[in-house]
């Protein structure tokens, strides 16, 4: 949101000197904001009014999630039949972990592009007008990479679909041209502004941060064990069947994720659709091969899984766990003026700086690692992100030590047992935990 609003205000997709992601994510959201006259919103400092700032982007993300479900249905319908399509898309729609596709994330934006590229490549094998569909497929995949670099791993499954149709290298080249050219806008823009060294530094920095993919596997297994078991069982079946379509979608991304960069739970989003597809095919296979003889028993099992998933998701989405975030933001807006430096994460800084035009609000609290605080008084909104990042530099811990807690906003998430399913999903909502408002004098 911060970068989209910055693009809306300045017309420049590049924010500062940090090159961590390409531009299409903020371009897409900024376009929606512009079409809905978002800049004309004039919220008050009341916490309820502040929530209205997220209404338009959240509706947009919800529509993208609906589109994802439709695209999954069409892909599976063509490849595996209508029964598998119904099961796969239904699992994607109702299982608890798929709530993440409604969040304002780059992965949520690129998912329809990836699914659209796969669907167009499949359609290209069933028509005489192959070249145009292949080019459009490459364009969508190029835009996905222009949203977030890891999307490049999807080229393996799309190129395989295109090549196996006519066994022509020329078809693959048609796909690769837009796929490669569109993401090149990012480094070319950096070269234009004589910032290619910063671009290299930003890209390399992300590859040097690392943790084990087992951490992500473990976290996924905890927060949505049903999807984890069904999805990986479906992938295991795909291995036994040598289903190249599913394996070329799943394996390259997992290899990339395990070898490069820092992994978080939402990085798994790229392969959630293929896991739902694999799970749907697995559930259909149980009936197809008469593993369960009685149709009524099979239907009962399927309905049981879907109802269980729907109920679990409903138990999650009926709760508002973000109220303390807006209360904390409202408190800061109403109690501190421009003469105070406010250190906070990008979750809040864009509202303070771009919407309410407050001065002395760095885009990220980590700015104090590179630039000194110039005001006499400093306020810190200490949330889970700040606590996790304390190891990034001594300045963050020093700022914490030199401030005292003025106000605390407890999150509603504390009222749930996050060890009990489906509330295990609450573990992925660190922003909704305790937020401290701390202030100090001469924090340097």
Residue ranges and their predicted role:
Residues 47-51, 55-79, 116, 120:
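Transmembrane-helix motifs of polytopic, lipid-linked glycan transferases
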Residues 97-110, 264:
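Short acidic/glycine- and proline-prone juxtamembrane loop motifs at membrane-interface regions
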Residues 143, 154-241, 254, 258-262, ...:
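Transmembrane-lumen/periplasm boundary regions of multi-pass, lipid-linked membrane glycan transferases
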Residues 78-83, 117-134, 144, 166, ...:
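Membrane-interface transmembrane helices that cradle and orient dolichyl/undecaprenyl
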Residues 91, 109-126, 136, 140-141, ...:
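Specific aromatic-rich, kink-prone transmembrane helix
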Residues 20, 319-322, 335-390, 439:
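Short periplasmic/luminal acceptor-recognition loop of GT-C membrane glycosyltransferases, typified by
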Residues 282, 297-323:
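Transmembrane alpha-helical segments
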Residues 283, 376-444:
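Aromatic/acidic, Gly/Pro-rich catalytic loop(s) in extracytoplasmic/lumenal soluble domains
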């Amino acid at each position: 949101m911060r970068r989209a609003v910055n693009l809306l205000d300045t017309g420049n997709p590049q924010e500062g000197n940090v090159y961590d992601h390409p531009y299409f994510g903020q371009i897409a959201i900024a376009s929606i904001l512009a079409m809905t006259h978002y800049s004309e919103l004039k919220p008050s400092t009341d916490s309820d009014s502040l929530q209205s700032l997220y209404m338009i982007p959240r509706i947009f993300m919800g529509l993208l999630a609906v589109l994802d479900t439709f695209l999954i249905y069409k892909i599976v319908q063509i490849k595996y039949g209508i029964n598998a399509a119904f099961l796969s898309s239904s699992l994607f729609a109702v299982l608890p972990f798929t709530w993440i596709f409604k969040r304002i994330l780059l992965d949520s934006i690129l998912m329809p592009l990836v699914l659209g590229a796969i669907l167009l490549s499949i359609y290209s094998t069933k028509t005489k007008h192959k070249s145009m569909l292949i080019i459009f497929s490459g364009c969508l995949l190029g835009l996905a990479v222009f949203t977030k670099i890891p999307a490049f791993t999807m080229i393996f499954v799309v190129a395989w679909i295109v090549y196996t149709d006519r066994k022509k290298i020329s078809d693959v080249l048609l796909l690769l041209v837009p796929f490669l050219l569109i993401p090149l806008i990012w480094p070319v823009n950096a070269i234009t502004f004589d910032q290619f060294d910063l671009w290299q530094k930003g890209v390399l920095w992300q590859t040097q941060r690392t943790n084990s993919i087992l951490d992500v596997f473990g976290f996924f297994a905890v927060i949505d064990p049903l999807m984890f078991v069904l999805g990986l069982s479906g992938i295991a079946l795909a291995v036994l069947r040598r289903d190249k379509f599913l394996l070329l979608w799943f394996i390259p991304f997992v290899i990339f994720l395990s070898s490069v960069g820092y992994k978080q739970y939402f990085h798994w989003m790229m392969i959630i659709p293929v896991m739902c597809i694999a799970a749907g095919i697995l559930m259909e296979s149980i009936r197809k091969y008469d593993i369960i003889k009685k149709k009524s028993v099979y239907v009962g099992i399927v309905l049981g899984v879907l109802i269980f998933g729907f109920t679990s998701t409903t138990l999650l989405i009926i709760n508002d766990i973000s109220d303390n975030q807006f209360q904390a933001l409202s408190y800061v807006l109403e109690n501190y003026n421009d003469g105070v430096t406010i250190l906070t994460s990008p979750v809040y800084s864009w509202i303070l700086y771009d919407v309410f035009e407050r001065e002395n609000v760095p885009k990220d609290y980590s700015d104090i690692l590179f630039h000194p605080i110039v005001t006499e008084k400093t306020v810190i909104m200490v949330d889970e992100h700040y606590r996790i990042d304390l190891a990034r530099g001594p300045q963050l811990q020093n700022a914490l030590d030199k401030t005292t807690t003025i106000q605390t906003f407890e999150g509603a998430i504390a009222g749930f047992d996050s060890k009990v399913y489906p509330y295990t999903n609450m573990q992925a909502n660190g922003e909704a935990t305790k937020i401290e408002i701390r202030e100090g004098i001469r924090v340097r």
